[in-house]
A protein has these predicted regions:
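C-terminal nucleotide
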Residues: 1-118, 129-168
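Glycine-rich active-site/cofactor-binding loop and its immediate structural neighborhood
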Residues: 125
Length: 168
C-alpha cells in the first residue's frame, strides 16, 4: 500500500505463491494482553517528529520494498531480520512504543529462536508479530504458558475475523 502526498492510496497486489505460504507458516501472532489507546501512543511521536525521527520513519518505509524483494526471491528467513530492524527503528520514535513487559517478551522470543519481530500498530501493547520457525516454538511456549497465540492466515480479500474468543 502506498500513501501518496495528495491523499490517494495505491494498492499493489502480491501474488499468492509458495514464498508467501512459507512466510505465513513461520509467523506467530502473540497477543500481549496489554491494552492501550493507539491514538495516545501515536501522538507521542507523530506530533513531535525531529529530523532524526523522520529518518527512522523513512527507513521503516524502505522496509516495505525490502519485504517485497524477500517474497520475490524466496529468501524468506531474511524476513525475521527485517522485522527486527523495523522494531529497533520504531522503538527509537518514542519511549511509549514499548515497555519492560514487551521488551522481556521480545527478548525471550529471540532467545527461544525467533529471528525478529515487531509490535503491530502504534505500539504500547496489542499484538506482537514474530518470525519463528516451528522447531523453536515449543521452547518459546514452555516458558510462556500464559501467552495467547492468535492463529491466522493470509487472505486475498483483506482482513477477516472468523471468530475471536481469546481473553487477556
Amino acid at each position: 500500500i502506498k500513501f501518496n502526498k495528495n491523499g490517494s492510496i495505491k494498492v499493489k497486489k502480491i501474488k499468492q505463491n509458495n514464498n508467501l505460504k512459507k512466510l505465513e507458516k513461520n509467523l506467530l501472532l502473540i497477543y500481549t494482553s496489554i491494552n492501550r489507546t493507539a491514538h495516545e501512543i501515536a501522538s507521542s511521536y507523530v506530533n513531535k517528529l525531529t529530523k532524526s525521527k523522520k529518518k527512522y520513519i523513512e527507513s521503516i518505509i524502505t522496509h516495505v520494498n525490502e519485504g517485497e524483494k524477500i517474497l520475490k526471491t524466496g529468501n524468506i528467513d531474511d524476513f525475521g531480520e527485517l522485522l527486527h530492524s523495523s522494531w529497533m527503528l520504531k522503538k527509537k520514535l518514542s519511549s511509549a512504543i514499548s515497555n519492560s513487559k514487551i521488551d522481556d517478551l521480545y527478548n525471550h522470543a529471540l532467545l527461544s529462536g525467533a529471528s525478529g519481530g515487531k509490535l503491530l500498530g502504534a505500539g504500547g501493547g496489542g499484538f506482537l508479530l514474530l518470525y519463528m520457525k516451528k522447531k523453536y516454538r515449543k521452547k518459546f511456549f514452555l516458558k510462556s504458558k500464559k501467552l495467547i497465540n492468535i492463529p491466522f492466515k493470509f487472505s486475498n480479500i483483506g482482513s477477516e475475523v472468523i471468530y475471536n474468543n481469546f481473553q487477556s
